[in-house]
Amino acid sequence: MTSRRRAASTALAGLAATAVALTACGTGEQAAPGADDKIKVVASTSVWGSVVQAVGGDAVEVESIVSDPSADPHSYESTPQDAAKVTDAHLVVFNGGGYDEFIEQILGSGNQKPTVEAVKDEHEGEQNGHEGHGDQPAAPEEHGHEGHGDQPAAPEEHGHEGHGDQPAAPEEHGHEGHDHSVNEHVWYDLHVVHEVADQVATELGKLQPAKAEQFRQAAGQFEAEVGALEGKVGEIAAANQGKPVIVTEPVAHYLVEAAGLQDVTPQSFVKAIEAETDPSAAAVAEIQNAINAKQAVAVIYNPQTESPVTRNVRTAAEQNQIQVVEMTETLPEGKTYVQWMDTQIAALQNALNQNR
């Protein structure tokens, strides 16, 4: 299997912004569903599958290719069965940015159909401006895989309040030498999730126009729930602005940023973890010293990428009475996206409350 970071580093070279991108083409499309048929949607992961289900309800049949909570979409290798599911789908929803490259590979092989993509590479269209994500052009440009047709005008822009200013076109960074402004884990960016729900509702409405209003209302309800999560994150930011945290992997980067927290993880450590190499003795010593000096109020820990090094970080934090907050990469079984995020946001809030 390929390295979980190799695909991401290739696809993210030159990634300028997170945005929702929409693709629709005629070649190879599945016939539109009948008025009483379920719309077949393939999602790359159960995270995006949960968003689709919230918007589509009983009108959709959602197939998430990566649904095992312990699976790693970075290195997932698609099967002929996966390709057949994509071919048979009316709509495909995926993350992009190299995170779920297997979907992009299938789509690139001729299965061209309407898609909603959560990450937009600068090579695929105009850069999108999010307030605080950097000074970039205003709206995502709809784009396609090679051979895809043009689409109507781009969706209206949304701002990211509370995100730090970043350059419009950052230097190329993969996960080897990861820059914190470039991160494909956009489901931790609640605003992007809001945009994805909007686009899903739009595409479902095109497939079944008689239910377009139903999808719009469902998206509105989902977005209200996401908005409530944003409110909770805003409360965290108001009470904890600038407080330092250490992360074992920046999977929750956008949430940490929105919460007003300062990631003080030594860059040498981050670069090694992201490149899936063992951190140098100096990097390990640097993060150990930071923890021993209690230079962070919490450690954000991804148990799904646990290694002896990260376990030692966790142990050191616990020995120094520094709160450890688990934030995972994939959706736990039996939980919706909103339930999952709510649980993690509450855990972060509780940990920070311990340091007041």
Write out the residue ranges for each language-model feature.
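Extracytoplasmic metal-acquisition and chelation regions
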Residues: 2-356
